[in-house]
From Swiss-Prot:
Record-level GO BP terms: L-histidine biosynthetic process
EC numbers, comma separated: 3.5.4.19, 3.6.1.31
Reactions listed under catalytic activity: 1-(5-phospho-beta-D-ribosyl)-ATP + H2O = 1-(5-phospho-beta-D-ribosyl)-5'-AMP + diphosphate + H(+); 1-(5-phospho-beta-D-ribosyl)-5'-AMP + H2O = 1-(5-phospho-beta-D-ribosyl)-5-[(5-phospho-beta-D-ribosylamino)methylideneamino]imidazole-4-carboxamide
Gene designation: hisI
Record-given protein name: Histidine biosynthesis bifunctional protein HisIE
């Protein structure tokens, strides 16, 4: 889906001696850094006009629209430039949730002296826990409490949600900050289990939260 109208003072952007400016691309919902690419004035102009990311390929010496062959288009939500006007930050909706040509979500998936490939770090703990919950759903483990909830089914999960909600209320009534934090964490966890059970992604929840930012 195309982004809303974008604007940027092109004449204020400071390009290097090659006419390029680095562009950091970030997921607009959870903040994950997806990639670093390069733009020139023309690619930036096309990005503003089309609402999708266009970059300059230094190896091929040509413009390229992200997702041209893979279909993993990036719809731009916002473009910012830094205090020196020589770097860009784009927040995007990443189609297919894959930004890297290797098939990884983020291009920043390598770590260590040997550059071994690892799972890119999630942007927040909630995402990390949700990913683990989904793994326990899809690949059950005998000794896993999370897996046992999925095995027990929806009624068990909903019962736990009700119990945890009541415990949050009681902790708040007691005005116990430490207990409140602990009980809310339990509630968040069981809510994530319910989301995973019903195949609702955190992205869908984030989108609804965006509508409530008033």
């Amino acid at each position: 889906m195309p982004a809303t109208a974008l604007s940027l003072p092109l004449d204020e952007i400071r390009y290097d001696e090659r006419g390029l400016v680095p562009a950091i691309v970030q997921d607009y919902l959870d903040g994950t850094v997806l990639m670093l690419a390069w733009m020139n004035r023309e690619s930036l102009q096309k990005t503003l006009e089309t609402g999708r990311t266009w970059f300059w390929s230094r190896s091929r010496q040509e413009l390229w629209p992200k997702g041209e062959t893979s279909g993993h288009v990036q719809w731009v939500k916002s473009i910012r430039y830094d205090c020196d006007s020589d770097a860009l930050l784009l927040t995007v909706e990443q189609v297919g949730h894959i930004a890297c040509h290797t098939g990884e979500r983020s291009c920043f998936h390598r770590h260590g002296a040997k550059g071994e490939s690892i799972e890119p770090p999630p942007a927040d703990t909630l995402s990390q826990v949700y990913n683990i919950v989904c793994q326990r759903r899809d690949f059950p483990q005998l000794q896993s409490y999370t897996s046992s909830l999925f095995t027990a089914g929806d009624n068990k999960i909903l019962k736990k949600l009700g119990e945890e909600t009541a415990e949050v209320v009681m902790a708040c009534k007691d005005d116990d900050p430490e207990a409140i934090a602990s009980e809310v964490a339990d509630l968040f966890y069981h809510t994530l289990v319910a989301l995973a059970y019903h195949r609702v992604s955190l992205r869908q929840v984030y989108e609804q939260l965006q509508l409530r930012r008033r």
